[in-house]
């Protein structure tokens, strides 16, 4: 299973690297949008590597316990930040909305909470024998993850509505797929498919947003004529 997972992670990292290159070379994205996508892809890659580290060091000699704790902390802590990066991408304007600032503050508070509760093993624990285990309050991580995904879904639907985009309903099956995959991962933690699915969905989300933004005229910022004709028809 470990060898299979390592191969999947290698493929995962290749796809993310390609998406980073594609984002940097894009002529349709502004600097803010490029920054958001690049940060999202980088975070997914980082968390994917952290998951590999946790698998390698779990059950290893106690000298690696600190690495096991650190990798799990960063993995659990940074996960809700991925949807926030994608929300940041949605608005082409440089002004950051208050609700987004509040969401970032919640992420910061969550990181502090996670760090403060490490000695008590509320969300997760690593024994003296260097064995990982979920804590009694593991649901806090799950709640933060789902809350971030819900925020992304709502923000995407609201943005797509402004484009009169008939494909805006596609965000629901994407979110449903990710939610179902997360439930499977929680029920069967040995599968390790979460971040492969997140990578796939981030690529689909990139395509979805690109199609949506391409409906705008580059000069006026309004729906282009071809889109207007289709709306009338």
Regions found by a protein language model. Name each.
Residues 50, 54, 87-91, 95, ...:
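Membrane-water interface at transmembrane helix exits
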Residues 63-73, 127-138, 194-198:
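Non-cytosolic membrane-interface motifs at loop->transmembrane helix junctions
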